[in-house]
């Protein structure tokens, strides 16, 4: 395979630093904003650590952050949440890795599954609460047909980053100007993604 794309935090089962680059766990007001995360990434050593993470995973991949957005919603619930006891009664679809573990650590039954499996799982009762993204993408999935209580600003995805990946051998075979073009395209995608989400 020559390339691909995914959300950076999907790699957190392979390397815990993937959460730092993809979806730091800390909600608004206590964690990094998208703007402060990008300042760290581009101007304060974050990019070098991102490249090091890929080297340490040994996957023969060159990654590029391409989509920086957030914050995401806490999610959809059958009944209002007025306390942690209310929250803990749900089987809650969460992202994999550290976000899911964080919810488990506070007593929430965290279940990880792909986006396309969420609505069928809600309809079958396999889960009874879910998060995916934010209002527009969530409405496309149709969660509002099953769940009526929606809470914005989640604990887990204040900054959300997606990547593009190039097979390491393919990347090494590119001319310098092609590698430079990949860097420029990545930065342009970040800018476009931010303006699209504003």
Residue ranges of predicted features:
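N-terminal secretory/targeting leader peptides
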Residues: 1-37, 52-198
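Active-site-adjacent segment of FAD-dependent monooxygenases/related oxidoreductases
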Residues: 37-43
């Amino acid at each position: 395979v020559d390339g691909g794309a995914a959300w950076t935090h999907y790699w957190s089962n392979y390397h815990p630093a993937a959460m730092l680059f993809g979806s730091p766990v800390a909600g608004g007001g206590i964690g990094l904003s998208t703007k402060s995360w990008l300042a760290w990434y581009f101007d304060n050593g974050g990019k070098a650590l991102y490249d090091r993470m890929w080297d340490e995973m040994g996957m023969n991949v060159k990654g590029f952050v391409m989509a920086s957005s957030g914050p995401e919603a806490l999610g959809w619930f059958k009944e209002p949440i007025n306390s942690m006891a209310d929250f803990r009664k749900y089987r809650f679809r969460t992202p994999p890795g550290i976000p899911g573990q964080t919810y488990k650590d506070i007593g929430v039954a965290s279940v990880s599954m792909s986006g396309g499996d969420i609505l069928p799982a809600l309809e079958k009762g396999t889960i009874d609460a879910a998060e995916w993204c934010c209002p527009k993408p969530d409405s496309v999935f149709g969660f509002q047909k099953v769940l009526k209580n929606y809470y914005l600003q989640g604990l887990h995805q204040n900054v959300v980053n997606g990547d593009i990946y190039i097979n390491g051998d393919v990347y090494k075979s590119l001319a310098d100007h092609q590698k430079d073009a990949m860097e420029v395209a990545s930065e342009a995608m970040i800018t476009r993604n931010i303006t699209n989400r504003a």
